[in-house]
């Protein structure tokens, strides 16, 4: 019998409050804030710019450069949260590791998970070299000349180049011949989160599709940690950024089982409690590990309409030590609403038309500034099957017009 104490939740803004600090207050962080507040948690949201989506709904908000360890330590010591939840990758994770080692704070899922996954080198070496999981062939290089040598030395064409520290497709491109190398190298150097630096070059896998397998480590009623899986999420990307997702994505039983085994291995090693977005390539019954995010995943926004508990509720419950329910309610899809204009304080037209069809919903993120390819919202839909849901979600997002 487990001796783990049952979670006790306090009252916000009182001496009994359970305080959670989110590092990153974008659209995903905003939904986590809402999920936590529904459970009576006092939430502090931190981001690098004012009036971020999560700032608008948190009990308190701070504007901090989260890559500055001194500034980050100061806000953590000021607020004294019980739990720190990294919601983005651009964080001084060395500090989180040190604070967790000191016993000063608990990081969800773990400080080590946040540290390893902020850098493609850390998580790729863990997956491929420590855990022995199947991945694309890869090399890490620091110069354009080393990139050429890696390609000629076995990676071959076509191949994919990415900064070791970037997100949302920034700095990522496909190299199809030697003529592409110089431009791809420059683009990768411009797209890194911390400026120019190291890149990963990967051999191209001829996959049929890619999925996100949302994997949840949570405590059951007996206090034991159990790993549970959501139904696989299919998605389409343009320039490395997701434009639509759907759930469930059809898979062979063998591929689904192998996907779960890979996800179990990597999340089990990272440890802790919470949701992980495990990205996988699939060809027939073969599965390759790609990446993992120890937090809700952008493609998982479909779960806002498709699941009994969406990915944000799952993360909130898990990090608080509560049981979760990963069941699918109905096939669903999400479709991104882009800004389309460069402006502050935009207005949204066509919302009534977007919501006129039964089984639809939208989320407008409330970002203070729009630009052409910035994700400003998402259209959501459910239907009898994913094809119908995708078509319906696309109609929702297309109906919404952004006006400066």
Swiss-Prot record:
GO MF, one annotated term: ATP binding
Record note on quaternary structure: Homodimer.
Binding site for ATP: 120, 162, 167-172, 202-205, 210
GO cellular component annotations of the record: cytosol
Function: Involved in the de novo purine biosynthesis. Catalyzes the transfer of formate to 5-phospho-ribosyl-glycinamide (GAR), producing 5-phospho-ribosyl-N-formylglycinamide (FGAR). Formate is provided by PurU via hydrolysis of 10-formyl-tetrahydrofolate.
Keywords: ATP-binding, Ligase, Magnesium, Metal-binding, Nucleotide-binding, Purine biosynthesis
Signal sequence residues: none
NCBIfam families reported in the protein's UniProt record: PRK09288.1 (NF006766), purT (TIGR01142)
Positions that bind N(1)-(5-phospho-beta-D-ribosyl)glycinamide: 27-28, 87, 298, 367, 374-375
Chain sites annotated for binding Mg(2+): 279, 291
GO biological process, one term: 'de novo' IMP biosynthetic process
Pfam families, alphabetized: ATP-grasp, PurT_C, RS_preATP-grasp-like
Family in the record: Belongs to the PurK/PurT family.
Sequence ranges assigned to domain ATP-grasp in this UniProt record: 125-320
Pathway(s) it belongs to: Purine metabolism; IMP biosynthesis via de novo pathway; N(2)-formyl-N(1)-(5-phospho-D-ribosyl)glycinamide from N(1)-(5-phospho-D-ribosyl)glycinamide (formate route): step 1/1
Reaction it catalyzes: N(1)-(5-phospho-beta-D-ribosyl)glycinamide + formate + ATP = N(2)-formyl-N(1)-(5-phospho-beta-D-ribosyl)glycinamide + ADP + phosphate + H(+)
Keyword Acetylation annotated: no
Chain segments annotated as transmembrane: none
Name of the protein in question: Formate-dependent phosphoribosylglycinamide formyltransferase
